[in-house]
């Protein structure tokens, strides 16, 4: 097929029957062996592995210091916890933050302020991916200032 014909076929001006030469409708069907793929029982599908680990994040909005126990139990089980202290009195909120700081220190986790009076507690070996532009170049196409 010449280049003009290819261009015309690409634009849809002529029919492209070039592919029909290569297809054979009369192909021989082979005997199916009946063997199926056998997977190793130790191999697991990625979605099954994620469900087994129980990836979840706990959110707690405590009313008083008595709710600190629930925060501690979630964090002790390896669940990252978001604590929203906006509904608490400032003195009780300070006590909860002190408790959370001790909890994260004792279990080798981290505590991070996400917003005003909102904190994120992450257990050890948990990675936090930030959406900030720290790693992006400051100049380039997207810098239109």
Curated annotation (Swiss-Prot):
Entries under Pfam families matching the protein: SepF
GO cellular component: cytoplasm
Matching InterPro entries: Cell_div_SepF, Cell_div_SepF/SepF-rel, SepF-like_sf
Cellular localization per UniProt: Cytoplasm
Keywords, ordered alphabetically: Cell cycle, Cell division, Cytoplasm, Septation
One example of a Gene Ontology biological process annotation: division septum assembly
Entry function: Cell division protein that is part of the divisome complex and is recruited early to the Z-ring. Probably stimulates Z-ring formation, perhaps through the cross-linking of FtsZ protofilaments. Its function overlaps with FtsA.
Record-stated family: Belongs to the SepF family.
Subunit structure: Homodimer. Interacts with FtsZ.
Protein name: Cell division protein SepF 3
Source species of the chain: Streptomyces avermitilis (strain ATCC 31267 / DSM 46492 / JCM 5070 / NBRC 14893 / NCIMB 12804 / NRRL 8165 / MA-4680)
Lineage: Bacteria, Bacillati, Actinomycetota, Actinomycetes, Kitasatosporales
């Amino acid at each position: 097929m010449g280049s003009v014909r290819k261009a015309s076929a690409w634009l849809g001006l002529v029919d492209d029957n070039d592919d029909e030469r290569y297809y054979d409708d009369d192909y021989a069907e082979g005997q199916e062996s009946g063997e199926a793929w056998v997977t190793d029982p130790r191999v697991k599908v990625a979605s099954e592995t994620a469900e087994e680990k129980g990836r979840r994040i706990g959110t707690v909005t405590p009313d008083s210091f008595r709710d600190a126990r629930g925060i501690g139990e979630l964090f002790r089980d390896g669940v990252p916890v978001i604590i929203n202290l906006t509904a608490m009195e400032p003195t009780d909120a300070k006590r909860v933050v002190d408790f959370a700081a001790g909890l994260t220190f004792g279990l080798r986790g981290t505590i991070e302020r996400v917003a005003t009076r909102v904190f994120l507690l992450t257990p050890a070996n948990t990675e936090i991916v930030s959406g900030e532009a720290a790693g992006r170049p400051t100049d380039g196409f997207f810098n239109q200032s």
